C-alpha cells in the first residue's frame, strides 16, 4: 500500500448543497427558504417566537428581584489561612485583615468585605479583622488562641447601588 492509495470511504464526505443556482438544481429560486417574508430574509428571526403560541418566557411566572443593597463578600476558609501562614505569605504575628490578605495574594480582591468560613483546621494563633464570620470559624480561631474582630461592612455608594 502506498500513501497515494489512501482514500476516504465512499460517502463519508458529502459536498455541500449550493443553493440558488438555477431551477434544475432543485434548490433554485427561493433556495429552500420557502416564500417571501421575514423568515426568507437573512439574519432576521424573532427570538422566542413560537408561531403565535404564547412563548415559554411569557408563560412562566416572574420570580424574585435584585436587591441593590446586597453586599458581596470575599470568602476565605480557615484551611486557606493556615496554608498561607505555613507558606509564610502571611505574617501570623500581626493583624490579618482584608488589606493584608489582598497584599499577600491570598485574596484577589476584598469586594465589599471579607467573610471567614470554618472549613479546615487552624493551628496558628491569629488576630483577624473581618466583616463577617461563621460561628464555627470564630470557635476554631479562639480554640487556637487567636481573636476575631467583626467589622461593620462598608456601605455601597449611592452611585453604585442605582
From Swiss-Prot:
Annotated spans, Disordered: 1-41
GO MF, one annotated term: structural constituent of ribosome
A biological process term (GO) from this entry: translation
Biased segments, Gly residues type: 21-37
UniProt xrefs under InterPro entries: Ribosomal_uL15, Ribosomal_uL15/eL18, Ribosomal_uL15/eL18_sf, Ribosomal_uL15_bac-type, Ribosomal_uL15_CS
Entry keyword set: Ribonucleoprotein, Ribosomal protein, RNA-binding, rRNA-binding
One GO location term (cellular component): cytosolic large ribosomal subunit
Domain of life: Bacteria
Family: Belongs to the universal ribosomal protein uL15 family.
Subunit comment: Part of the 50S ribosomal subunit.
Cited function: Binds to the 23S rRNA.
Protein name: Large ribosomal subunit protein uL15
Lineage, top ranks: Bacteria, Pseudomonadati, Pseudomonadota, Alphaproteobacteria, Hyphomicrobiales
Amino acid at each position: 500500500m502506498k500513501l497515494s492509495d489512501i482514500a476516504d470511504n465512499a460517502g463519508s464526505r458529502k459536498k455541500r448543497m449550493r443553493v440558488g443556482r438555477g431551477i434544475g438544481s432543485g434548490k433554485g429560486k427561493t433556495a429552500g427558504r420557502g416564500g417571501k417574508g421575514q423568515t426568507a430574509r437573512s439574519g432576521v428571526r424573532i427570538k422566542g417566537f413560537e408561531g403565535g403560541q404564547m412563548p415559554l418566557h411569557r408563560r412562566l411566572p416572574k420570580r424574585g428581584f435584585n436587591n441593590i443593597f446586597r453586599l458581596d463578600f470575599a470568602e476565605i476558609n480557615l484551611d486557606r489561612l493556615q496554608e498561607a501562614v505555613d507558606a509564610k505569605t502571611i505574617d501570623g504575628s500581626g493583624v490579618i485583615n482584608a488589606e493584608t490578605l489582598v497584599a499577600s495574594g491570598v485574596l484577589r480582591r476584598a469586594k465589599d468585605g471579607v467573610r471567614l468560613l470554618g472549613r479546615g483546621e487552624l493551628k496558628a494563633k491569629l488576630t483577624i479583622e473581618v466583616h463577617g464570620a461563621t460561628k464555627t470559624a470564630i470557635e476554631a480561631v479562639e480554640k487556637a488562641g487567636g481573636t476575631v474582630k467583626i467589622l461593620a461592612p462598608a456601605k455601597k455608594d449611592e452611585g453604585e447601588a442605582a
